[in-house]
Structure formats: C-alpha cells, structure tokens
C-alpha cells in the first residue's frame, strides 16, 4: 500500500501551493472514520479515561463513526455523554486548510460562502489559506429555552448592511450562527430536549440534506458537520422532549449507563476526584471506606425514596470522596495531628454531597433529604 505524502503545513500559504502538494480534501465524517480505523489497527483506545463502556457504549460509538452517522447519546445525568463527544476531537486530523478569513471554514477546493467564491475569483491560485487546528473545530451549545434559530443558524445583520452600504438581498449581510461556523468540524448540542420544538424543526434540513436556509435567502450551503447530541431518556425536567422527526433523522442512538460494578465506579471516582497533594500526605483513606462511599450511589439508584428516572450521577461519589477526605483533614487540623485516617464517623461529612445530587419522589420528600442521605450511608456501612 502506497504511503500518503506528508503535508508540510508551514510551507503552504496559498491555493496554488496546496494544489501542488497533492492535498485531497475529505468530509469530516470520512476524516473521523479514517482516523478511528488507524486507532483500532494500532490497538489504541480512542476514548481514554472513559471506564465501564469497553463492551457497550464505546463499540456502539465506533460502529456509528464507521457508518458516518450523526450520534445521539441517551442516558441519565453523570454518564460521561459530553465527555464521549469531546474526546472525538482526537479523531480529527491535526490540521486542515481553510480559506483565510472565512467565517465558515471554507474548504479551498469546495468553497461555500460568497466571501470564498469572490476571493478565489479575484486571486485564483494566490488565494491565501490558513491551517486550522482540530481543537478549534469543535463547537458545543447547551440547549436552553432561550436559544433561537439566529443563534444556531444565522440571521441578517442590519448593522453590517448599513456599514457596508449593502442591500438586505446581498449574501454578505448574513451573520452566521454557531452551526455554520462549525462547518468541517464536530458540533454538539447538549440536553437536546430543552431546545424548543420549533428550533428542533430548524435542524431537520441540516441533518437530512446537510444544508441551511437563512431568512428566505435562495442560498444552499451544504455544510460538512458531524453532529453529536446528548439527552436524558426521561423528561424528568418537564422542559420538553425530542420531536419525533428529528430523532428519526439522527442515525445512531447510543444508550449510556452507570458503572455496573463497584470496581469500575471506584476507578472512575479515584480518577475524577480532586484530592490535593497536601491532603494525600495528611489523610489516608482505606479501601473499605472508598467502597462504602461507592455503595452509597448503588444504594441510592435502587432506593424507593429516590427518583430512578432522574438517576444518581457519578458526581455524587466524586464529591462524597472529596468531602470525606476534607472531613478527616479538618479533624486533624483541629487536633494538631500530622496524619490521620478517614473514619466511619467522617462519613457524616458526605451528607451535603448526597442531598444535592438525588431527586426524591413524594415519599422521599416527606422523609426529608437529610434523613434519606443518612439512611443511604447506614445501608452502605452494613
């Protein structure tokens, strides 16, 4: 197999040099697919630091990427949905060329915007290009009820029209939204159900045809984007749901889950907990206490007073471990002890980490969040 010629990014500044280099443009989904294939062949893990998904979510995600699908991660809170999306950045090529000054990352060989067409028509092979790093090709938007079509797709900019003395019928007066600006990259919408239904409808054409429409302009922009969405399976927030035709257009829906055993949960907590070096020197924590803390989350997920539709985030055990260490550290400071252990009595200090991270059903509200937290610790110790 013939080895691909390595492109010298620092020596290519214009379209003519890019053509001479033999560079071939490819779609972002093709790019991610090719890099995933290399990663799998080299026996590397494309999702480093994601634990407990080795036989479930990661293979599903790899299959979706190989199929060049847009992806919806569906799962309860604290299941690493956004982290999975963010780690896809590493599957992009390190650098890609774009028309210099383009707002929508125009491919020099397949320009989209009027700006790029005009620049190429004017300068030809002398059209300046710049190399964009993969970290800048990732866009993310948290869906909130106030997000508008203009935010996502774009709108006419009357100030730009006035300053440039242009008619509203001129393409140059368009102010592009975050989706066109993420062209040739990965775009993530977190908590998709929180997006108003009419805004979700605006995404239909982008997902089906890959193009956008702005304020009645007869303009077709076939965007090149890998879309990743995250959502909760149950509408426990009462803010909305994913409209069926939109769900139908997202090719792969991947179900995430909580750790299936304490060992995996323990590894995640130890990886994510922010225990300071000074705390590690002063406070020792036994494996038994760590396991009791993990058991609190497992007990909560099956507890009759806790709303299972809401879920119990992995953030509970992370915050609880930090609080347990801080509780022992505080005791050591008060008694002028150089070193100490986390005792079972220190677990009272993890109650604030529990009460804010569990949603209670009606009976649980009657019992009270403090008492429910105490009962969960009590069951875990037993």
Describe every region a protein language model picked out.
Residues 56, 60, 83, 288-292, ...:
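Amphipathic alpha-helical interaction segments
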Residues 308-316:
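An accessory alpha-helical subdomain
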Residues 67-71, 298-306, 318-339, 353, ...:
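AAA+ ATPase "lid" subdomain C-terminal helix
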Residues 2-263, 274-291, 299, 304-308:
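Conserved ASCE/P-loop NTPase catalytic core
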Residues 309, 329-382:
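C-terminal engagement/docking regions of AAA+ P-loop ATPases
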């Amino acid at each position: 197999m013939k080895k691909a010629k390595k492109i010298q990014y620092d020596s290519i500044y214009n379209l003519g040099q890019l053509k001479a280099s033999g560079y071939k443009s490819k779609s972002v989904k093709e790019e991610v697919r090719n890099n995933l294939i290399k990663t799998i062949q080299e026996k590397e893990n494309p999702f480093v630091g994601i634990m407990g998904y080795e036989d479930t979510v990661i293979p599903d995600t790899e299959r979706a990427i190989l199929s060049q699908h847009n992806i919806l991660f569906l799962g309860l809170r604290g299941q690493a949905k956004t982290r999975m999306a963010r780690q896809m950045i590493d599957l992009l090529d390190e650098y890609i060329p774009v028309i210099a000054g383009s707002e929508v990352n125009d491919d020099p060989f397949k320009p989209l915007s009027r700006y790029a067409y005009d620049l190429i028509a004017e300068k030809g092979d002398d059209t300046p290009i710049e190399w964009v790093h993969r970290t800048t090709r990732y866009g993310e938007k948290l869906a909130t009820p106030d997000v508008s079509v203009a935010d996502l797709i774009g709108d006419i900019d009357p100030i730009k029209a006035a300053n440039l003395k242009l008619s509203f019928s001129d393409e140059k007066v368009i102010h592009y939204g975050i989706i066109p600006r993420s062209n040739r990259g990965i775009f993530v919408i977190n908590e998709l159900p929180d997006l108003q239904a009419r805004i979700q409808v605006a995404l239909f054409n982008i997902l089906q045809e890959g193009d956008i429409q702005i304020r009645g302009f007869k303009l077709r922009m076939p965007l090149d984007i890998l879309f990743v969405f995250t959502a909760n399976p149950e509408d426990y927030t009462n803010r909305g749901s994913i409209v069926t035709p939109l769900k139908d257009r997202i090719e792969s829906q991947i179900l995430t889950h909580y750790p299936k055993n304490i060992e995996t949960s323990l590894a995640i907590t130890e990886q994510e907990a922010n225990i300071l070096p000074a705390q590690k020197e002063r406070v020792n924590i036994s494996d038994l206490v760590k396991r009791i803390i993990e058991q609190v989350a497992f007990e909560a997920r099956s507890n009759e007073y806790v709303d299972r539709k809401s879920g119990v985030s992995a953030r509970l055990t992370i915050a609880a471990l930090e609080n347990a260490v801080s509780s022992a550290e505080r005791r050591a400071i008060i008694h002028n002890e150089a070193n100490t252990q986390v005792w079972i009595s220190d677990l009272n200090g993890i109650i604030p980490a529990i009460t804010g991270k569990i949603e209670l059903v009606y009976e649980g509200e009657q019992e009270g969040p403090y008492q429910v937290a105490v009962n969960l610790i009590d069951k875990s110790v037993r």
